[in-house]
Amino acid sequence: MDDGDLGNNHHNFLGGAGNRLSAESLPLIDTRLLSQSELRALSQCSSLSPSSSASLAASAGGDDDLTPKIDRSVFNESAGSRKQTFLRLRLARHPQPPEEPPSPQRQRDDSSREEQTQVASLLRSLFNVDSNQSKEEEDEGEEELEDNEGQIHYNSYVYQRPNLDSIQNVLIQGTSGNKIKRKRGRPRKIRNPSEENEVLDLTGEASTYVFVDKTSSNLGMVSRVGSSGISLDSNSVKRKRGRPPKNKEEIMNLEKRDSAIVNISAFDKEELVVNLENREGTIVDLSALASVSEDPYEEELRRITVGLKTKEEILGFLEQLNGEWVNIGKKKKVVNACDYGGYLPRGWRLMLYIKRKGSNLLLACRRYISPDGQQFETCKEVSTYLRSLLESPSKNQHYYLQSDNKTLGQQPVIANESLLGNSDSMDSETMQYLESGRTSSEVFEEAKAVENGNEADRVKTSLMQKDDNADFLNGVEDNDDDMKKRDGNMENLATLSNSEMTKSLPTTTNELQQYFSSQINRVQ
């Protein structure tokens, strides 16, 4: 572009309207060479006068932008394109008149005034404020509100010292009247028992103490005692639906009984005295007891329940017996074994239950319970258990001390010979072994002493020791006459036992081994 063209362009740029840009000079401007500030200044220039622009806007219907004209032959119009093309016409935005600021002298609504009046009356009734004084204070407050509008004063609600009687009445009404129906599900939890009391302080003097009763008879009972002595008791928590409540005292008794029966660790087995005497005062034959296959108490139980056929009748009879129930269902009961026969030693118990045998119902024994709480199903298990107690040295010592309190040399009588077997049918060796209550090691030592010829001295010494133990337990003091008399008796007994032992025991080692093996097999 030469200098002449630049001059013409400059003339066209400034021509016409002086400082205004003419429309003819727009095609001659290269906008690629203009900066951002120059483009902004160019956009602000216009050759139209204000009057012509106003007339153009009026002819367009007051719109800033004219409605575009679309050639229907070229442009395929559709509903979507029509919405995009003629979506919204930018109308002239007329400035809204400025809003007046809210006047500070606006009065309160009647509804809010009435609500505040109700709140004030409730507060007065709660704190027992004098009505005349409150009315005067309220009137003064309204006058101050009219003088200084826009400010809120609460002079009419000045805190007064509350009356204790009114507070307690409100608390009683709140606890008794506000009963909301709870949803179904897990019952409400009882408060932590460690929180023994809770204090509700309103003024420093009005206090309500909450005590939780921890006794089994009043579970879940919460009592509230105020400072004036008014007791507010709430009922226990709503129980869950289902089976009826259990008797707490009965459950506690059954738990104590179960702990006494099952808990074996509570007894010191080393200090237990093995008692083999039954209710008749005789010693129980353990070998005969081990050979019993059926329940020895079955005949006696059948005799006392003659005529009882239904389950209800047998349960009624079982309830009348002296004993303790095993469970809450009251289907099994523990009774003393001595009340129904002398087959077991004193202190043993029976667990009775209803047994179905064919189409008949019978009262039978299910378990044999020892004094230390162990349970056995058969008499053979009972015999094995008693033998295990007798095998230890401490048990043998207790057993001999207890049996030797009676007259020395008295032979124990076999209990229940009709059921457990006749003692006459037993051989002399078995009877001597059972009656003596000695172990195989003691018998072997006696046999060796017989061979060496020292049996008389040994038997005399053992008998004197037993007699001393018996006198010590009975509290008998030693006298000279008694000592001489006892020495004579000991010599006679030693001579007698020496002759009997010599006749009964074998003399050779092979015979001794055969004798001991046969005795062990017979016991097992």
Swiss-Prot record:
Reported phenotype of the disruption mutant: In strain cv. C24, delayed flowering time during both long and short days associated with a down-regulation of the major promoters of flowering FT and SOC1. In strain cv. Columbia, no delayed phenotype.
A molecular function (GO) term: methyl-CpG binding
TM region positions: none
Family matches, as SMART domains: AT_hook
Species for this entry: Arabidopsis thaliana (Mouse-ear cress)
Biased composition (Basic and acidic residues): 106-116
PANTHER family cross-referenced by the UniProt entry: C2H2-TYPE DOMAIN-CONTAINING PROTEIN, METHYL-CPG-BINDING DOMAIN-CONTAINING PROTEIN 8
Extra facts: In strain cv. 24, promotes the flowering time transition, probably via the transcription regulation of FT.
UniProt domain MBD: residue ranges: 334-406
Name of this chain's protein: Methyl-CpG-binding domain-containing protein 8
Database matches in PROSITE patterns: MBD
Lineage per the UniProt record: Eukaryota, Viridiplantae, Streptophyta, Embryophyta, Tracheophyta
Tissue specificity field: Expressed in shoot meristems, roots (vasculature and tips), hypocotyls (vasculature), cotyledons (vasculature and hydathodes), young leaves, buds, flowers and stems. Detected in stomata.
Keywords: DNA-binding, Nucleus, Transcription, Transcription regulation
Keyword Cell membrane included in the entry's annotation: no
Domain notes: The methyl-CpG-binding domain (MBD) functions both in binding to methylated DNA and in protein interactions.
Gene Ontology cellular component annotations, sorted alphabetically: nucleus
Compositional bias per record (Polar residues), positions renumbered to this chain: 75-84
SUPFAM superfamilies per the UniProt record, alphabetical: DNA-binding domain (SSF54171)
Functional note: Probable transcriptional regulator. May regulates developmental traits such as flowering time.
Residue stretches of biased makeup (Acidic residues): 136-149
Compositional bias (Low complexity): 45-60
Region (Disordered): 45-151
Annotated localization: Nucleus
